Amino acid sequence: SSAASDVYKRQVLCSLGDFDTLITGDMDGKTETKLVEAYDFPDIEVLLVGHHGSKYSTGTTLLESVTPEVGVISVGDNSYGHPTEEALLRLTDAGMSVYRTDMQGNILITVD
């Protein structure tokens, strides 16, 4: 269906040699599960954390599938409580280094 195909258009995988970055946009956990079941992703070096660190995004299934080394959360002052403590705990439990635009400002990622 059109709605189902839209689910897969919300993610971007950027690769340069062995360096891979995954951007999942505002996907929720259920959609992330469908995504990892549909595609064989490489290990991810940098993951742009979904939905500004919402408790409903960047779930354990995704994290176990793509094993990211670094998580970047694009977030500013907001009334939603993003990123949530639950999301931050999932990221650190997955062994990721986490960077946040509300704490570090602009984040520059370079690849040699």
Language-model regions, residue ranges each:
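Short, small-residue-biased leader/transition segments that mark boundaries at the very start
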Residues: S1-Y8
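Beta-strand-turn-beta hairpins that frame and shape the catalytic cleft
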Residues: S15-T21
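Gly/Thr-rich phosphate-binding loop signature of adenosyl cofactor/nucleotide-binding cores
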Residues: D26
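Residue-level marker for buried hydrophobic side chains located in beta-strands
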Residues: T21-I23, V49
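Cap/insert and terminal regions of metallo-dependent hydrolase folds
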Residues: T33-N106
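Conserved GTPase G-domain signal focused on the G5
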Residues: S2, T110-V111
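Short beta-strand scaffold segments in enzyme catalytic cores
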Residues: R10-C14, I107-I109
